[in-house]
Amino acid sequence: MDKSKRPFIKSKRSFRRRLPPIKSGDRIDYRNISLISRFLSEQGKILSKRVNRFTLKQQRLITLAIKQARILSLLPFTKRKGFERSELTPRTNALKARNKNKQNKYQNNQTKFLSNF
């Protein structure tokens, strides 16, 4: 039988339904950081309802809880690795000299301006 003439047969393979992300005993609250932080992306953004597999009500509660936790500084607004504190580097002599030259130019301009009056 030709490939195009064969009838389409859907496989009868069973599938396992994924468990809901929130169990019945879990309380959606701004103090429950371990629960809330699961629904944030790598950048610290709130994941969508479709990604989280939430109902509309659950998504609204999670969003409000995350926003409250951010305002109370329990969660960061962003999770950027570039802004982590690094070791302080000592100032070089060239930088000090450059700043000193800028100050001298500023003072010279001030004195010239004031001497005109």
Curated annotation (Swiss-Prot):
The keyword Coiled coil does not apply. PROSITE patterns: RIBOSOMAL_S18. Residues 86-117 are annotated as: Disordered. GO terms for cellular component: mitochondrial small ribosomal subunit; plastid. InterPro entries: Ribosomal_bS18, Ribosomal_bS18_CS, Ribosomal_bS18_sf. One of its GO terms (biological process) is translation. Keywords: Plastid, Ribonucleoprotein, Ribosomal protein, RNA-binding, rRNA-binding. Its main location: plastid. One of its GO terms (molecular function) is structural constituent of ribosome. SUPFAM superfamilies: Ribosomal protein S18. Disulfide bonds: none annotated. Pfam families: Ribosomal_S18. It is found in: Plastid. HAMAP family: Ribosomal_bS18. Belongs to the bacterial ribosomal protein bS18 family. Part of the 30S ribosomal subunit. NCBIfam families: S18. This is Small ribosomal subunit protein bS18c.
